[in-house]
């Protein structure tokens, strides 16, 4: 190989990469399009003639020649959380009050003008979330958000997005770097694509978000390249010890770091001091003409240390919220009203509508919430209703145009009997919801089976809405325990179930016997007990018996569990039917428990804050974190004056030096375990 050809290929790659960063990141092109295209073709011809010159980060390698057959599922090392929504400044202020309580700070006298907290405001782009992983500076993987825990590996399509760098713009890349951001479609490009689809006789896309999300899942990356998706980065996760010197301490510094690495960052982002400046930012951009679709403002606590202290709920980071623009409202006619029964027996009136486009989707159903709301609105079948869709919530009826009410409009009120099982409905004292009290109501049974089989519970593949209905209606399944008595022969009698599919479903059901207690607890569907709450409760009460015997006062004292949850748990276990169900499940070996049951773990570390640095002798970092948190402690990512202990292993990072400077006590792994005198030698279980 001629060294001059190698050098020329390297020069072309470097120049084209710099040109892409200048164009997409800094909005300051250094090459005319025609010049870029000519240089690109020169590199392409060189690589075609000499394939050994091709490198993974070459601009020519963005688009593959062969369509993918499928997208494999990948698990996110760091979950992608959703954002809590606020729909007006008042809800934003309520969020800040909750945040201040979590951080242990005094309320702000005038939260709009004298806020002591500093925030970063970023426009909320209406697109699709993307998780990028770089290994030694090269793009290794791009994945969709999915359910936040697992998504689809769409790396070939990610490589086709010109604004996403294939190589980080740094001479000192970390071993692993994760970047999060939003893929979106510029409005002009969206219009061009839809015009092409109309000309071809294809239906147009409803909105840019749907088009962007659908494009990401195209099996042919050439289609992705042709649609010219764009990307804004907004978060990164880096390993300890990188970058050299001072790592980012704030969200704003993270955004600047992303730009330095070659990622496009929305230039309209801004640091705001207090909610007053946040609301000014929101008002400035609400209704503004932008080159992309935006449905609100994302407000993030600027300090990464305070973000760490605030932590997460089951679904959201406590330190961030989306302040959404006012919801879109449209009028349409109510064709009928039906009463829908959920798994807890809650009866919700639902309006069936003349289909109407709303917020990019075709809406044909909308919630009327409850009996009080029905009376307040004075809803009639045949009325013209005002329907609103705010964010990702289901559409709701917010008003009735009574002046348009036809003469034959029919008043509606909730039935007195359950529409599914005809049991008289009840309204518990103090509740707005009307419920069906029948434990054998088919609608409740269907919902309970679906919840039990859901991914975060027992994770039974193949047991969805349709199959749950068949099991209840055709096979007489009445409790989740009945699932474990089903045979392939019984299932083969159901519509759509053959020999193979019946065998697979029975195997999936039987495999779920091995799921741990925390998943079973979540699957029981106890009110207010979500995934995270179930994990906390299972950590403190390692068997169903221990939890069933606990008082509301005992449960409420656990860090992260409040009185409302505690009372709901005690009330659930007090029901004879629920106790019988647990006995049935335990007779079936559910949940799978260790041979020797652990006693309830003490809370000896309650209120203490720990930082872990280096590699511990026997515990992984995750195991050490779980051990500390199960005893009431909290593990944070950075050392501060509020840190009580730093646990030090081999090859510690800069946190050790920081702890020594601040005079914070240092612990070995053995000294950490010795903090709990109830732990016997060799017992390292959380």
From Swiss-Prot:
<dbReference type="Pfam" id="PF01653">
    <property type="entry name" value="DNA_ligase_aden"/>
</dbReference>
<feature type="binding site">
    <location>
        <position position="418"/>
    </location>
    <ligand>
        <name>Zn(2+)</name>
    </ligand>
</feature>
<feature type="domain" description="BRCT">
    <location>
        <begin position="600"/>
        <end position="686"/>
    </location>
</feature>
<dbReference type="Pfam" id="PF14520">
    <property type="entry name" value="HHH_5"/>
</dbReference>
<dbReference type="Pfam" id="PF00533">
    <property type="entry name" value="BRCT"/>
</dbReference>
<dbReference type="InterPro" id="IPR001357">
    <property type="entry name" value="BRCT_dom"/>
</dbReference>
<keyword id="KW-0227">DNA damage</keyword>
<dbReference type="Pfam" id="PF03120">
    <property type="entry name" value="DNA_ligase_OB"/>
</dbReference>
<dbReference type="InterPro" id="IPR036420">
    <property type="entry name" value="BRCT_dom_sf"/>
</dbReference>
<keyword id="KW-0464">Manganese</keyword>
<dbReference type="InterPro" id="IPR003583">
    <property type="entry name" value="Hlx-hairpin-Hlx_DNA-bd_motif"/>
</dbReference>
<dbReference type="Pfam" id="PF12826">
    <property type="entry name" value="HHH_2"/>
</dbReference>
<keyword id="KW-0862">Zinc</keyword>
<comment type="function">
    <text>DNA ligase that catalyzes the formation of phosphodiester linkages between 5'-phosphoryl and 3'-hydroxyl groups in double-stranded DNA using NAD as a coenzyme and as the energy source for the reaction. It is essential for DNA replication and repair of damaged DNA.</text>
</comment>
<feature type="binding site">
    <location>
        <begin position="82"/>
        <end position="83"/>
    </location>
    <ligand>
        <name>NAD(+)</name>
    </ligand>
</feature>
<feature type="binding site">
    <location>
        <position position="122"/>
    </location>
    <ligand>
        <name>NAD(+)</name>
    </ligand>
</feature>
<feature type="binding site">
    <location>
        <position position="145"/>
    </location>
    <ligand>
        <name>NAD(+)</name>
    </ligand>
</feature>
<dbReference type="InterPro" id="IPR001679">
    <property type="entry name" value="DNA_ligase"/>
</dbReference>
<feature type="active site" description="N6-AMP-lysine intermediate">
    <location>
        <position position="124"/>
    </location>
</feature>
<dbReference type="InterPro" id="IPR004150">
    <property type="entry name" value="NAD_DNA_ligase_OB"/>
</dbReference>
<dbReference type="GO" id="GO:0003677">
    <property type="term" value="F:DNA binding"/>
</dbReference>
<feature type="binding site">
    <location>
        <begin position="33"/>
        <end position="37"/>
    </location>
    <ligand>
        <name>NAD(+)</name>
    </ligand>
</feature>
<keyword id="KW-0235">DNA replication</keyword>
<feature type="binding site">
    <location>
        <position position="421"/>
    </location>
    <ligand>
        <name>Zn(2+)</name>
    </ligand>
</feature>
<feature type="binding site">
    <location>
        <position position="300"/>
    </location>
    <ligand>
        <name>NAD(+)</name>
    </ligand>
</feature>
<dbReference type="InterPro" id="IPR033136">
    <property type="entry name" value="DNA_ligase_CS"/>
</dbReference>
<dbReference type="InterPro" id="IPR012340">
    <property type="entry name" value="NA-bd_OB-fold"/>
</dbReference>
<dbReference type="Pfam" id="PF03119">
    <property type="entry name" value="DNA_ligase_ZBD"/>
</dbReference>
<dbReference type="InterPro" id="IPR010994">
    <property type="entry name" value="RuvA_2-like"/>
</dbReference>
<dbReference type="InterPro" id="IPR013840">
    <property type="entry name" value="DNAligase_N"/>
</dbReference>
<feature type="binding site">
    <location>
        <position position="324"/>
    </location>
    <ligand>
        <name>NAD(+)</name>
    </ligand>
</feature>
<keyword id="KW-0234">DNA repair</keyword>
<feature type="binding site">
    <location>
        <position position="436"/>
    </location>
    <ligand>
        <name>Zn(2+)</name>
    </ligand>
</feature>
<feature type="binding site">
    <location>
        <position position="182"/>
    </location>
    <ligand>
        <name>NAD(+)</name>
    </ligand>
</feature>
<dbReference type="InterPro" id="IPR004149">
    <property type="entry name" value="Znf_DNAligase_C4"/>
</dbReference>
<dbReference type="InterPro" id="IPR041663">
    <property type="entry name" value="DisA/LigA_HHH"/>
</dbReference>
<dbReference type="Pfam" id="PF22745">
    <property type="entry name" value="Nlig-Ia"/>
</dbReference>
<keyword id="KW-0479">Metal-binding</keyword>
<dbReference type="GO" id="GO:0005829">
    <property type="term" value="C:cytosol"/>
</dbReference>
<dbReference type="GO" id="GO:0046872">
    <property type="term" value="F:metal ion binding"/>
</dbReference>
<dbReference type="InterPro" id="IPR018239">
    <property type="entry name" value="DNA_ligase_AS"/>
</dbReference>
<dbReference type="GO" id="GO:0003911">
    <property type="term" value="F:DNA ligase (NAD+) activity"/>
</dbReference>
């Amino acid at each position: 190989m001629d060294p001059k050809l190698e050098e020329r290929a390297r020069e072309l790659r470097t120049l084209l990469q710099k040109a892409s960063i200048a164009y997409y990141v800094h909005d300051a092109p250094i090459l005319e399009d025609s010049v870029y295209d000519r240089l690109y073709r020169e590199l392409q011809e060189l690589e075609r003639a000499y394939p050994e010159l091709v490198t993974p980060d070459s601009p020519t390698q963005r688009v593959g020649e062969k369509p993918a057959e499928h997208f494999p599922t990948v698990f996110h090392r760091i979950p992608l959380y959703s954002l809590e929504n606020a729909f007006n400044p008042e809800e934003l202020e309520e969020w800040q009050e909750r945040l201040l309580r979590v951080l242990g700070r005094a309320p702000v006298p005038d939260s709009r003008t004298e806020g002591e907290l500093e925030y970063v405001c970023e426009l909320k782009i209406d697109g699709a979330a993307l998780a990028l992983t770089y290994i030694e500076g090269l793009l290794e993987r791009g994945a969709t958000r999915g359910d936040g825990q697992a998504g689809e590996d769409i790396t070939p399509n990610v490589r086709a997005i010109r604004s996403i760098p294939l190589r980080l713009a740094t001479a000192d890349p970390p071993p692993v770097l994760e970047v999060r951001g939003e893929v979106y479609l510029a409005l002009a490009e969206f219009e061009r694509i839809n015009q092409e689809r109309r000309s071809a006789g294809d239906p147009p896309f409803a909105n840019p978000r749907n088009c962007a999300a659908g494009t990401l899942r195209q099996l042919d990356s050439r289609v992705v390249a042709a649609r010219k998706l764009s990307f804004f980065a907004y978060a990164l996760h880096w390993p300890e010890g990188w970058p050299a010197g001072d790592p980012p301490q704030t969200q704003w510094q993270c955004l600047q770091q992303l730009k330095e690495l070659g990622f496009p960052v929305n230039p309209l982002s801004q640091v705001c001091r207090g909610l007053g400046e946040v609301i000014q930012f929101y008002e400035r951009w609400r209704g503004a003409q932008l080159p992309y679709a935006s449905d609100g403002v994302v407000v993030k606590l600027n300090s990464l240390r305070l973000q760490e202290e605030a932590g997460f709920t089951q679904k959201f980071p406590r330190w961030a919220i989306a302040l959404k623009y006012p919801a879109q409202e449209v009028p349409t006619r109510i064709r009928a009203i039906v009463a829908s029964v959920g798994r807890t027996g809650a009866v919700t009136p639902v309006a069936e509508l003349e289909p109407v486009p709303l917020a990019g989707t075709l809406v044909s159903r909308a919630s009327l919430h409850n009996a009080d709301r029905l009376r307040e609105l004075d809803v009639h079948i045949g009325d013209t209703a005002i329907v609103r869709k705010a964010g990702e919530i289901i559409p709701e009826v917010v008003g009735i145009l009574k002046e348009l009410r036809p003469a034959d409009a029919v008043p509606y009120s909730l039935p007195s009997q359950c529409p599914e099982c005809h049991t008289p409905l009840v309204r518990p004292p103090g509740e707005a919801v009307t419920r069906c009290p029948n434990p054998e109501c088919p609608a409740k049974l269907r919902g309970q089976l679906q919840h039990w089989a859901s991914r975060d519970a027992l994770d039974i593949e193949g047991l969805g809405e349709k199959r749950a209905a068949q099991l209840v209606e055709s096979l007489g399944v009445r409790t989740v325990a009945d699932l474990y008595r089903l045979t392939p022969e019984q299932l083969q009698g159901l519509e759509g179930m053959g020999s193979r599919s019946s065998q697979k479903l029975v195997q999936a059901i039987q495999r779920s016997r091995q799921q741990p207690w925390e998943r079973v607890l979540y699957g029981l569907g106890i009110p207010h007990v979500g995934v995270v709450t179930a994990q906390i409760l299972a950590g403190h009460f390692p068997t169903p018996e221990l939890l069933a015997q606990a008082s509301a006062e005992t449960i409420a004292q656990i860090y992260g569990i409040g009185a409302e949850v505690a009372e709901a748990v005690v009330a659930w276990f007090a029901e004879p039917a629920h106790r019988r169900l647990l006995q049935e499940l335990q007779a079936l070996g559910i949940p799978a428990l260790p041979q020797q049951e652990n006693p309830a773990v003490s809370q000896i570390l309650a209120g203490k804050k720990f930082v872990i640095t280096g590699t511990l002798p026997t515990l992984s970092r995750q195991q050490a974190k779980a051990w500390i948190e199960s005893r009431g402690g909290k593990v944070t990512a950075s050392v501060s004056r509020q840190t009580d202990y730093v646990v030090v292993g081999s090859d510690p990072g800069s946190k050790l030096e920081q702890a020594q400077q601040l005079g914070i006590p240092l612990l070995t792994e053995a000294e950490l375990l010795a903090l709990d005198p109830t732990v016997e030698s060799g017992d390292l279980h959380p």
